[in-house]
C-alpha cells in the first residue's frame, strides 16, 4: 500500500495533521493504537485557556478542526481576563470528554482521502536519510511520501504511582516501545519528560454547599469564526471552587517519600511541567502558601466523573484517599479514578525545522508532545502546521512558516526549534513579544488568508473575510469623517456618559479614543449596519492605536532581521572570534536567519555582529 502522507498517532496533533493533508488532496493514512481513543482527553476536560484559547482560534482561522469540535461539544464557555485588556483575553471551554472524541472521530471517518487504521508502528522505513514509510507490529510495510509522528505520551510510556512503575500509556493503553529506539538509532537525541493527572471523583459524593459555584459566561461565545451551533447559555454546567487545607499539606509532607517523584522511585529521569506542577511540588516549592485553589470540573454530561483540577499527584492510592478527604466538599468523596504521573520519551526539538520536518531525516515530520510540548492545543496547532507543510512539500510548493508576529503558533514553533525545552513546554501570553497584535478577536484577520492560500479555507469563507475587512475600513472612514460640535444636544448627551465637555468640534474617531467612551456611545450619533465583531475591531483599533503601531514597528524591525538569511550549509567552525558557547549553539540549532540566531540563548549581540560580517564577506565573494 502507498500513501502520500502517513500520520502516526490519533491524538489532537494527529487529528489536525491527517485532516489537513486529506483536505489538501493528499491520500492520507492515520495509524493509531486504538481507534476508540482518537481525540481522547486523558487529562483535563477543557479546550482553550490563557494563550491556548487564542491558539484554538488560530487553528480555526487556518482551517483546522479543534475550534469547531469544541463548540459542538462544550458544556461551559468562559472568556478569561475579560476585565483586562484585549491582548490577554482568551476563551476556555469545559469540554465533554465523551462527546468531543466521538464528534472528532465522526469527522475523521467521513473525511475524503483519509483512511484510519488501527495498529502499532514499530519502525520507520528510511533510505538515504529520507523516510519512505512505516513498519507495523505485524511486519506489514506501508509506504508514503511523508510521515508525521504524533505519538503523544506513548513513546516508552510508564505510569508512576507511589513505588510502582507500569509500562503503559494513558488509560492503561499499550505504549509504543520500539519507535523510540528506532528514532535513537537514526541519530535523534531523545529526552525523558513527565506529566501527571489528578483524581476523578463521583459527582454524587460531593458536598457542594462547602464549595463556591463557578458558572459559564452569559454571552454565547464560540471558538470558530464559521457558523457553529448556538447554545443556551442558561443550560451550561457549573464548575465548583474549593481549596487545599493545612491538613492536606500535612498529609503530603508526612508522606512525601512515598510519592514517585520524591523517593517512591529512584530511577525517574523525566522532567515535569513547570507551569502545571503536581500538588507535592506546590507544597514543597510554595511552602509559605496556606492553601491552593482546586476546581471541581465536570468531565461529561454522560458521566458522574468530576476532575479535581490542580491536584495531580503520584502518591499511593491510600494516601490519595486521605488527601482528597481533607478538602472542603470532598470529605465523603468517592474516588472513581486515581491520580498518576506518566513518564515518556520525546525528541529534543532543536532537531526539527520551522516547518516541523526533522533535520536528520527528510520528509519525516513531528508534532505535539513528541516535540516536548504539553497541552491539547499546543499539540493540535503543531499537527495542523506539520500536515500543511507535508502536503505543500509533496505539491512542490513553498512551506508555510508563521512568524512570531503572525500568531501564537509562530511563537510556539520558533521557541521549540530555537530554544529547545527542559520541561514540557506550555504556551503563555508572556512568551509573545507582540501580544497586542496576536489577540483572540483578530485571529481570522491575521491568519485566514494563509489558510485560503494552502487550500483549507473555501472561497465562501474567504469572501466573508474580505467583507469583514471592508466593513472595518468603512466604519473607520466614517468615524474619521463624521464631526460633532459642542451644540446643546451633544453637550447634554456627553454629560450623561459622563465625559469632559467639548471645547471645539471633534471627529467621532477622536472621541472614541477617550477611555470612558464606548462604541455603544458612538451609536447615538451614527448608526452602523454591522454586527458586534466588526465594531469590536474598530473600537480596539482606535483605543489601542498607538500601542498597536509601536508593536507593528517592532515586528517590522524584526522582519528585516528575519529576511537576512543564513545559508543551510554554513560551517560555524570557519568563523573566527565567535564565543565557543555561541558556536556550539549555532551549530546545534542551525538558525535559518539572523533574527532566529538572535533568539538563541548563549548567542550574544557581539557574536551576531561577527556572523553578519562573515555573511557579508561571503556575499561579496
How should these model regions be labeled?
Residues 431, 448-607, 613-621:
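Extended, charge-enriched "interface" segments that sit outside catalytic cores
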Residues 125-141:
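Conserved beta-strand-loop-beta-strand element in the redox core of flavoprotein oxidoreductases
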Residues 3, 137-146:
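Core beta-strand elements of the Rossmann-like FAD/NAD(P) dinucleotide-binding domain
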Residues 19-123, 150-167, 174, 178-180, ...:
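Conserved N-terminal/central alpha/beta ligand/cofactor-binding core
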Residues 1-13:
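Beta1/beta-strand and adjacent pyrophosphate-binding region of the FAD-binding site
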Residues 34, 52, 79, 180-321, ...:
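An anion/pyrophosphate-binding glycine-rich loop and adjacent beta-alpha core
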Residues 23, 379-402:
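Internal hydrophobic alpha-helix adjacent to the cofactor/substrate pocket in enzyme cavities
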Residues 307-373, 401-414, 532-585, 590:
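A glycine-rich dinucleotide-binding beta-alpha-beta segment and adjacent secondary-structure elements
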